UniProtKB/Swiss-Prot annotation:
Acidic residues biased stretches: 120-141, 148-170
Gene Ontology biological process: rRNA processing
Species per Swiss-Prot/TrEMBL record: Phaeosphaeria nodorum (strain SN15 / ATCC MYA-4574 / FGSC 10173) (Glume blotch fungus)
Places the protein is found: Nucleus, Nucleolus
Designated name of the protein: ATP-dependent RNA helicase MAK5
Predominant cellular place of this UniProt entry's protein: nucleus
Family assignment from sequence similarity: Belongs to the DEAD box helicase family. DDX24/MAK5 subfamily.
Any Pfam family matching the protein: DEAD
Length: 817
């Protein structure tokens, strides 16, 4: 019997078993050593039986007891193991045995039939010839009773010779395996049926045997003889053909050098544009030039070719870097335009058979020290005013070198010279205008005066175009400025060498491209997102550029379009330089991508095959509209520019049309069409069917933005409270702010509601949006009876037309005359 325990007292604590802590066993320090992964014996990964095939993981292997070590300094990866040499050799031997077993198994499934009891399958790759002959003799003796042993012995040598002949001359077929099987009664065994796994193994086996049984005499038999041209001959002939494809005889009238003509031929520029044919001879003659041409007309090469010609004509032979001075200074308003000018000049020089000049790009977002080193050796300097002045003014000796330039180019001059902008440009121009010697210098000292040419280019020179469209219209004439008025406007800003520089206007009658189609869509201010999405549905898989007036609009529209499965990319001035370049590169690479940008992308960007430009907001000035629309219909291509107009923007749109499409005094008064900007009508039924998608996407985008804004505000207030030594409580702060009413309270209430949305609610909205996006937009046809009419079934099956809609969709009216 068990001994009775005493009754526990309330004052005594209950007895508990004391937990014995197990001490960790001391780790045995096993020495590790570096080893190559190829020197280890790998184990095969067994696949589950439920899979019919390996699903792309055929031959998957694994290894154990190997550590991956990354060097903290260099970042290189190395592999270490604790196994000894004996263990590694055992693993390798097991791996070889496994591979031999796999090879035998492949032999069985490849050539049909299974070996009988007591028979071995002899492989050509592993079994030597002598063993093969002996095995064949034994099997013949056991299988055939009609021949004597003497006959078999006499034919042994002949059989070995036959085996050797098979080894040498066997074709790349699976019949090279030497094996014999017994005949059972009726005859030969039927071939075994193979599944997917066995068929894949068979294909690999046949390919390996074909590679190993290739005759070495085939290459020797055709020694000294070629059957057609070689690879290098084909490439050489192809390069010659490409060079001869373009005829550059139209450029010969400009008296360019042979090297430049070769570069133009390789770049496939068959003839000069109007601005190029007009300005290049004047610049090469030494004149100061003011060039006005529509966007996309080739203004970069108009001043780039004469600069390269001057570099080739007066190439400095001095190898001393200190004596080297830059040839040209090109100033652009934005980083993107400066990088694009650099890329165009580099491409022109790279295609030529001459030593290219050193081109330095000086823009913000990059290291100042590196740019300063590049300026010391540069032949051509391209940059923005702010960073140029920062680098030049803080450098040692760079100011004196910049004063020796022979070409000063001001691209997009209307923006650079506008009042109140780019103060650094004024400082640079003042430095270049100081030609007189200092007071302390002796009069006898000779000062070398530099013959500098000043080249000014832009698409707009009208001062009235820079006025705000949202303001009240001022009295007076808003017609295009004449040549005399434009020159007076520029002579006040820039000190030209000549009293009357050459003014060249390539498009006096219009400032827009000839093949540009302009359209206008009227909608409510709160429905701009919906009509933007509807408009993009009519242009599927086409590269589009959307312009806004604010960075916040870019940050809101980009996730809004991304939620709708559209490849949208952002671009604005607050982005890092690398992120801006990344967005532009992705926009160029993807054919149907969409770029949502501010006016930082309105000037100079040359992106090929941009078919659509959408103005989400009315531009602040008319010249901005001209440059925005100039991103499409470039280089004689066609394009569309569509403005989404809210009721409060109607007055600004009227002033925009009056300013942009006004006629100059000397322009011919011919009118081809009865309108300048066509009003486009989108089917309201289609817009109504797209509204649920747009509403959900807008909710999701607003939620993400509201949450980010709340976190940033909390961080700012919390940091301010810590600086003041006060405790910050967000709930108390909101209670005190509840009583305040005024402008913006409704917006703040919506932002608060959006920021409080849970993850579950967001996932539910995303699932609902995915369901809507998986369906086509029905234009009013019967989805159950597709052949009843209204649907082109042949086009639907072939995947032709606009695949976003179910049914026929009319265009927006651009094609109607």
């Amino acid at each position: 019997m068990k001994r009775a325990h005493k009754a526990p007292k309330a004052s005594h604590k209950a007895h508990k078993r004391q937990k014995v802590e197990k001490k960790p066993r001391p780790e045995i320090n096993v020495p590790k050593r570096k080893i190559r992964l190829d020197d280890l014996g790998w184990n095969q990964v067994s696949m589950p039986d439920r899979l019919e095939d390996f699903e792309g993981f055929y031959g998957l292997e694994e290894i154990e007891d190997v550590h991956v070590v990354k060097d903290a300094v260099t970042g290189n990866l190395s592999f270490e193991t604790t196994k000894t040499d004996e263990q590694i050799e055992q693993d390798i031997e097991k791996a070889w045995q496994r591979e031999e077993e796999e090879a035998k198994f492949l032999e069985k499934i490849t050539f049909g039939g299974e070996p009988k009891n007591g028979e071995d399958v002899v492989e050509e790759e592993t079994a030597p010839v002598e063993d093969t002959v002996e095995a064949t003799q034994d099997e013949d003796a056991a299988s055939w009773g009609g021949f004597s042993d003497d006959d078999v012995a006499q034919n042994g040598d002949e059989q070995s010779e036959d085996v050797q002949m098979v080894e040498e001359d066997a074709p790349p077929t699976p019949n090279v395996v030497l094996s014999t099987t017994k005949a059972d009664g009726d005859g030969e065994a039927e071939p075994k049926k193979m599944n997917k796994r066995e068929r894949a193994a068979e294909k690999k086996r046949i390919a390996a045997l074909a590679k190993k049984t290739k005759k070495p005499d085939d290459d020797e038999a055709s020694e000294g003889k070629t059957f057609g041209p070689g690879a290098f001959d084909i490439l050489a002939n192809r390069a010659d053909d490409e060079d001869d494809e373009v005829d550059v005889s139209a450029w010969e009238e400009l008296e360019l050098s042979t090297k430049i003509l070769e570069s133009l031929a390789k770049l496939k520029f068959s003839k000069p544009t109007t601005i190029q044919a007009s300005t290049i001879p004047e610049i090469m003659a030494g004149r100061d030039v003011i060039g006005k041409a529509s966007t996309g007309s080739g203004k970069t090469l108009a001043f780039g070719i004469p600069i390269i010609e001057s570099y080739l004509a007066s190439k400095s032979k001095s190898k001393d870097v200190k004596d080297k001075t830059p040839l040209a200074l090109i100033i652009a308003p934005t980083r993107e335009l400066a990088h694009q000018i650099t890329a165009h000049l580099t491409a022109l020089c790279a295609k030529g058979a001459f030593e290219a000049p050193l081109i330095a790009s000086v823009t913000g977002g990059l290291a100042v020290q590196k740019q300063r080193r590049q300026l010391e050796k540069a032949d051509i300097i391209v940059g923005t005013p702010g960073r140029l002045w920062e680098v030049i003014s803080t450098g040692h000796g760079l100011l004196e070198k910049v004063k020796q330039i022979r070409f000063l180019v001001v691209d997009e001059a209307d923006r650079l010279l506008s009042q109140g902008n780019y103060k650094e440009l004024g400082e640079i121009l003042k430095i270049l205008e100081k030609d007189a010697p200092a007071e302390g210098e002796a009069e006898a000292e000779e000062t070398t005066e530099v013959e500098r040419q000043t080249l000014v280019f832009s698409a707009t020179f009208q001062k009235g175009l820079q006025q705000k469209l949202a303001g009240k219209a001022k009295g007076g004439s808003d017609n295009l400025m004449s040549k005399q008025q434009s020159m007076e406007y520029l002579l006040k800003k820039i000190n030209f060498r000549e009293e009357k520089p050459k003014f060249i206007d390539a498009n006096p009658s219009s400032q827009m491209a000839s093949k540009l189609k302009e359209g206008l869509i009227e909608c409510a201010g709160t429905e701009k997102d919906l009509y933007l999405y509807s408009l993009l549905m009519f242009y599927p898989k086409k590269r589009a550029l959307i312009f806004t007036n604010s960075i916040s609009a870019v940050r809101r529209l980009t996730p809004f379009l991304q939620n709708l499965a559209l490849p949208a990319l952002p671009l604005h001035s607050s982005m890092a330089q690398k992120a801006r370049l990344r967005s532009i590169e992705r926009f160029k690479e993807r054919p149907g991508s969409i770029l949502v940008a501010t006016d930082v992308a309105a000037r100079g960007l040359d992106i090929p095959k941009v078919e659509l430009v959408i103005h989400y907001h009315l531009p602040r000035a008319a010249d901005t509209y001209v440059h925005r629309s100039g991103r499409t219909a470039r280089a004689e291509a066609s394009g569309s520019s569509i403005l989404i107009c809210a009721p409060e923007e109607v007055g600004g749109v009227r002033r925009l049309i009056a300013k942009v499409h006004a006629r100059a005094d000397e322009a011919p008064k011919s009118k081809k069409t009865a309108y300048f900007i066509r009003t486009l009508d989108i089917d309201r039924r289609i817009v109504a069917r797209l509204k649920p998608r747009a509403s959900i996407s807008k909710k999701l985008a607003d939620t993400v933005i509201a949450k980010e804004k709340k976190h940033s505000e909390d961080d700012t207030l919390r940091q301010a409270a810590e600086d003041l030594g006060v405790d910050y409580d967000s709930e108390e702060f909101e209670k005190e702010a509840k009583g305040k009413k005024g402008r913006g309270t409704g917006r703040k209430k919506k932002e608060k509601e959006a920021s409080e949305m849970t993850k579950g609610e967001q996932q539910a909205l995303r699932a609902e949006l995915r369901g809507l996006l998986s369906q086509r937009i029905n234009t009013g046809v019967s989805a159950r009876y597709l052949t009843s009419g209204g649907i082109d079934v042949d086009a639907l099956m072939a995947g032709e037309g606009n695949m976003e809609f179910l049914g026929n969709v009319d265009g927006l009216g651009f094609d109607e005359e």
